[in-house]
């Protein structure tokens, strides 16, 4: 009798622990687009600030996502969950003259809801459909990887800046 109760207790313990999930949710499920400098300018000597307009109808209201970045070769930009097109304002201040140049970058994308587990927060992945820019300080921007998730290592965009003649 004692042997049966030990077996029953052991079986109950195995079933109880077997029912628990061991799924680890990602800690950082915010999705960022990675931008890498390419072309003649491989490291940013000037100062870069990037902002996102809060409201498309109001030019004076924006959110700064990168403030005075310098001496870098790459950056990460957050992507919106609901908009089909994200707009970024790149303000580049020349380090020798202080002259500021602002370019606008439009990223057209498809939003894809991503579900891992009921225990995890929802995430939104994206497929980049197109990118365009003004050409004041930015020469061009190219799509390098069109799938944006939260564990990408390959840059999504290659950013070509115009060569400065100081």
Role assignments for model-derived ranges:
Residues 21-82:
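Start-of-domain marker
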Residues 4, 43-50, 64-66, 126, ...:
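Hydrophobic transmembrane signal anchors and adjacent membrane-proximal interface regions, especially
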Residues 20-27, 74, 78-166:
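Extracytoplasmic cysteine-anchoring/structural motifs
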Residues 8, 57-59, 84, 114:
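A broad, structure-centric signal for solvent-exposed, well-ordered loop/edge residues
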Residues 1-32:
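Bacterial Sec-dependent N-terminal signal peptides
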Residues 1-2, 53, 108:
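Short, intrinsically disordered low-complexity segments
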């Amino acid at each position: 009798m004692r042997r049966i109760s030990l077996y029953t207790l052991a079986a109950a313990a195995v079933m109880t622990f077997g029912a628990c999930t061991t799924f680890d949710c990602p800690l950082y499920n915010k999705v960022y687009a990675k931008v890498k400098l390419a072309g003649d300018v491989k490291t940013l000597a000037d100062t870069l600030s990037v902002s996102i307009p809060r409201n498309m109808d109001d030019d004076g209201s924006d959110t700064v996502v990168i403030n005075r970045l310098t001496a870098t070769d790459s950056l990460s930009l957050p992507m919106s969950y609901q908009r089909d097109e994200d707009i970024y304002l790149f303000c580049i201040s020349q380090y020798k003259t202080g002259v500021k140049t602002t370019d606008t970058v439009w990223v057209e994308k498809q939003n894809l809801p991503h579900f891992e587990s009921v225990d995890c927060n929802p995430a939104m992945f994206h497929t980049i459909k197109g990118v365009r820019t003004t050409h004041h300080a930015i020469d061009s921007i190219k799509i390098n990887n069109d799938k944006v998730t939260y564990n990408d290592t390959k840059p999504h965009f290659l950013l070509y800046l115009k060569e400065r003649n100081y």
